[in-house]
Design a protein with these regions (language model features):
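A short, Lys/Arg-rich alpha-helix, primarily the initiator
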Residues: 1-20
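Short alpha-helical DNA-recognition segment
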Residues: 19-38
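Residues within the helices of the helix-turn-helix
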Residues: 12, 23, 53, 64
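Phosphate-coordinating loops and pocket residues in cytosolic domains that bind phosphorylated ligands
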Residues: 8, 41, 68
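Intrinsically disordered, low-complexity basic tails/linkers immediately adjacent to helix-turn-helix/homeobox/MYB/SANT
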Residues: 57-65
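Short, charged recognition helix plus adjacent turn
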Residues: 38, 67-80
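The alpha-helix within a helix-turn-helix
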Residues: 15, 26, 56
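Short, basic-rich loop-to-helix N-cap that marks the start of a DNA-contacting helix
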Residues: 43-54
Length: 80
C-alpha cells in the first residue's frame, strides 16, 4: 500500500477507536473538512508530516503513536 493509503487507514481506524467524527476532528484542529476527506480517502498525492502531527494532536495522541502501527512497517509500504 502507498503511504497515503496507510495514513488514510490509520486515521479512519483512530477515528473509530476514539469514537470521533471527521467533522469533530476538523473542528478541533481547524482543518478544512475537504482536506481531511481527501486524506481519509487517499486522494492527496502527499501528506506532510506537519499535517499528520495536527491530525494526531487532534486525536489526543503523539505523532509517534500515530505512526507506530504495522501499517507503516517497511514491508507493508510501497515507497518509491
Amino acid at each position: 500500500m502507498t503511504l497515503q493509503e496507510a495514513v488514510a487507514k490509520r486515521l479512519t481506524n483512530l477515528l473509530h477507536e476514539k469514537n470521533m467524527t471527521q467533522y469533530a476532528l476538523c473542528q478541533k484542529i481547524g482543518m478544512n473538512q475537504t482536506t481531511t476527506y481527501n486524506i481519509m480517502y487517499a486522494r492527496c498525492k502527499s501528506v506532510t508530516l506537519k499535517t499528520i502531527y495536527y491530525l494526531a494532536d487532534g486525536l489526543g495522541i503523539s505523532l509517534q503513536e500515530f505512526i507506530n502501527d504495522p501499517l507503516f512497517d517497511k514491508d507493508n509500504l510501497d515507497i518509491d
